[in-house]
Design a protein with these regions (language model features):
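Flexible, small-/acidic-enriched active-site or ligand-binding loops
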Residues: 137-139, 195-226
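Helix-loop "lid/cap" segments that line or gate small-molecule binding pockets
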Residues: 93-102
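A short, Trp-centered hydrophobic/proline-enriched beta-strand micro-motif
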Residues: 118-126, 172
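A short core secondary-structure module
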Residues: 149-201
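Alpha-helical interface subdomain recognition
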Residues: 1-81, 85, 102-107, 114-119, ...
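Long, acidic (Asp/Glu-rich), low-complexity accessory segments flanking structured domains
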Residues: 218-240
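Short Gly/Pro-enriched turn/cap motifs at secondary-structure boundaries
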Residues: 88, 130-133, 159-162, 180-181, ...
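Glycine-rich phosphate/pyrophosphate-binding beta-alpha loops
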Residues: 131-132, 158-163, 210, 247-251, ...
């Protein structure tokens, strides 16, 4: 089937991005992998390339585009090369939508120019120890001072992608107690400066995959957050978080599809080169059947991911549709990558092969942004069940 989601501008960006990855990332990726994070100055290079400013208004230094298609190209190209851009994904996919939706003009003038250049990297802190998917159960608090000039932030967050390098973190905290009718009431969002006194980074977490993405625990002890860094209105944070989940889940879905596509590419190349019993692994009927089945699943996932992308750009992607896309694409990726690793035999278990890293990187897709079980719950509710 002919693919129609991308135009000449997107393909030109793809060529530029592919050349950048080959020159700036592939030669040093093993060093990043061993270090457990990309170096901080790499994000300045992404800023210079224009990655961070695609969807930022021109008045703040961006390109002023209103599309996720360039992000989609980035997902495909990083997966194709078997690399990750550190924790930069959360900067654009997670943090930027909240800034664009909630920040005042004054806040945008302060935040966005440095966002675009990579001078200030952003992260998002929702998850807490012991809460997981139950965001309404968060314990972190932010109390307004008597003079109304600042909030006092106390609490802890965990699994924060980009938490080591972040210069600002959007922190979800309780500003009021939940009501009897709605336990989701009372949560607010703050753009917290990580240089603030009382803000500390705990452990840099050692993950199964996504090794170049810094992930950390955060702690807040009487952190003074200026009132002008409140994003949106008090007590409406849960609504804001829910509003942007569709775009986040699309990003995970599209990234998972791209990983599955890359896995087939890696496996095809390997079985054509690898010889056993005197002939290429690709010549065996089982190999052909396995890769054919994987390709069919990738084709289906591509159609779902592309359709969700078009709906997202049109402002029409519903929560249930986003959940469906995430569930389908991540489950396809799980099956396809596992089968492609199997075709590598013992070499597929070695981290020097991209399929092994891809296997580990992919596993979290069925967990973060809402587990597969949560996605099924959302879909079932939409069905009236």
């Amino acid at each position: 089937m002919r693919r129609t989601v991308f135009n000449e501008d997107h393909e030109a960006f793809r060529e530029t991005l592919r050349a950048f990855i080959e020159a700036e990332v592939v030669p040093v990726y093993d060093e990043w992998f061993a270090a457990g994070q990309a170096p901080r100055d790499f994000y300045h290079k992404l800023g210079e390339l224009g990655i961070f400013g695609i969807n930022v208004p021109e008045e703040f230094g961006g390109a002023g585009l209103d599309t996720h298609k360039f992000e989609a190209v980035l997902y495909e190209e990083t997966a194709r090369a078997g690399v990750q851009f550190g924790g930069s994904g959360v900067h654009v996919l997670l943090a930027l939508p909240y800034i664009k939706m909630l920040a005042t003009d004054e806040q945008k003038k302060r935040y966005l120019p440095k966002f675009v250049t990579g001078e200030e990297m952003w992260a998002l802190a929702m998850t807490e120890p012991g809460t997981g998917s139950d965001l309404a159960g968060m314990k972190t608090t932010a109390k307004l001072s008597e003079d109304g000039t600042h909030y006092v932030l106390n609490g802890a967050k965990t699994f924060i992608t980009g938490g080591v390098h972040a210069d600002r973190v959007i922190v979800a905290a309780r500003t009021s107690a939940p009501t009897a009718e709605d336990r989701r009431f009372g949560i607010s969002l703050f753009a917290v400066d990580t240089k603030s006194e009382g803000y500390s980074i705990g452990r840099k977490l050692d993950k199964l995959g996504l090794k170049t993405s810094d992930t950390a625990e955060l702690a807040f002890v009487d952190v003074k957050v200026p009132a002008e860094d409140l994003l949106g209105e008090e007590n409406k944070g849960f609504y804001y978080l829910g509003h942007n989940l569709a775009s986040e889940r699309w990003g995970i879905a599209f990234g998972a599809y791209a990983q599955a596509k890359a896995a087939v590419r890696f496996a095809k190349s390997y079985v054509q080169e690898r010889t056993v019993f005197g002939k290429p692994v690709a010549s065996f009927q089982n190999t052909k059947f396995e890769l054919a089945a994987c390709q069919a699943e990738v084709d289906a996932a591509e159609a779902v991911a592309d359709r969700a992308l078009e709906a997202l750009d049109a402002g029409e992607l519903t929560p249930a549709e986003a959940a469906s896309a995430k569930l389908f694409c991540t489950e396809v990726a799980h099956r396809v990558i596992d089968r492609c690793l199997q075709l590598h035999g013992g070499y597929g278990f070695m981290n020097e092969y991209p399929i092994a890293r891809l296997y580990a990187d992919n596993r979290v897709n069925r967990i973060y942004g809402g587990t597969s079980e949560i996605m099924k719950t959302i879909i079932a509710k939409d069905m009236g069940l």
